[in-house]
Amino acid sequence: MNLPRGPVMVDIAGFALTEAERARLSHPLVGGVILFRRNFHNIEQLRALTAEIRALRTPHLLIAVDHEGGRVQRFLDGFTRLPPMRVLGEAWDADRDQALKLAETVGYVLAAELSACGIDLSFTPVLDLDWERCAVIGNRAFHRDPEAVSALAEALQQGLGRGGMMSCGKHYPGHGYVEGDSHHLMPQDDRTLAQIEQDDLVPFARLADAGMGAVMPAHVLYPAVDSQPAGFSKVWLTDILRGRIGFDGVIFSDALDMAGAAGAGTYVQRADAALAAGCDMVLVCNQPEEADAMLAALAPPPQPQLAERLERMAGKSRAEDWQRLIATPDFAAAQAAVRQLAMPKDALAGPQVGEAH
């Protein structure tokens, strides 16, 4: 079925598509699918699932996952265990050149293993600064220093590219300064724009200049800048991110089922607000009935650049090509280097993030 990608990303329930999910994924407003741990049994099953999703439409639906490392790594069995990004920040403090090499290698292994399973995109890297205030960010952040975060994230972005994947910086303009978790409430950051620009915005601007493919805004309120949370704010998305920073990639909303998004109203109202503010694609997870109701009622604004932006995020090589690459001795050496950085406890340390979503 030839059908342009729409501005909505949805999820699925299990290891394979149901008939209801096939119908939902064939809706003209759908443009992508986000996978979770519940969708993963083993690599063979995952490859079959992504092939099934890709076969539904041309161009294929974007297939995404939160696969950062540490406690946010959805697929474990058969995948290289990835470290939390703080490990790379600690390496930066010891030896900057070595840390940059490690960051590039982590990005490469992360992306190539996913590419070999037919996945287009991981929502990574985390560009939030580690202000030691926000538990849900915590060791997901590289460092407190904007220069360290920028350099390490840019190296990781280069590795992602080598592994066939574009980057998605999050959580714009910075989730690290607030104490609350936007999965459960609406955090508020009372700093001025000048203060945020001096620190938290630096990595976003730096990676935008270096070819970052996408950005995911935070469900955080910055009242000194705008009365709307960043993900629903034309000031943050259109005026600052598009206008001042000059970012021209995809803007994905964070999941609209999060408590931090609830203030925008119903799911249709949330999607309307996010798209009107400047998001290209909205994520609706864990609420299939709400997703269906939203798809029936949503009337998105004109998005003349949507097709081009989403196509940039799509994997360009066949999964089989990546499967051959990850079987090589050189890739095994890269996996070994990454494995030395990670411990199994990393997947459990700190609050679990978004796994219910």
UniProtKB/Swiss-Prot annotation:
SUPFAM superfamilies, per database record: (Trans)glycosidases (SSF51445)
Residues annotated as binding substrate: D66, R74, R140, K170, H171
Name of the top EC class for this enzyme: hydrolase
Keyword Magnesium in annotation: no
PROSITE patterns xrefs: GLYCOSYL_HYDROL_F3
Chief site of localization: cytoplasm
Catalytic residues as annotated in Swiss-Prot or TrEMBL: H183 (proton donor/acceptor), D254 (nucleophile)
Pathway(s) per entry: Cell wall biogenesis; peptidoglycan recycling
Protein's cellular compartments: Cytoplasm
InterPro entries, alphabetized: Beta_hexosaminidase_bac, Glyco_hydro_3_AS, Glyco_hydro_3_N, Glyco_hydro_3_N_sf, Glycoside_hydrolase_SF, NagZ_Beta-hexosaminidase
Catalytic activity: Hydrolysis of terminal non-reducing N-acetyl-D-hexosamine residues in N-acetyl-beta-D-hexosaminides
NCBIfam families in UniProt: PRK05337.1
Its biological purpose: Plays a role in peptidoglycan recycling by cleaving the terminal beta-1,4-linked N-acetylglucosamine (GlcNAc) from peptide-linked peptidoglycan fragments, giving rise to free GlcNAc, anhydro-N-acetylmuramic acid and anhydro-N-acetylmuramic acid-linked peptides.
The family this protein is said to belong to: Belongs to the glycosyl hydrolase 3 family. NagZ subfamily.
Protein's recorded name: Beta-hexosaminidase
Organism whose genome encodes this protein: Chromobacterium violaceum (strain ATCC 12472 / DSM 30191 / JCM 1249 / CCUG 213 / NBRC 12614 / NCIMB 9131 / NCTC 9757 / MK)
Gene name of this polypeptide: nagZ
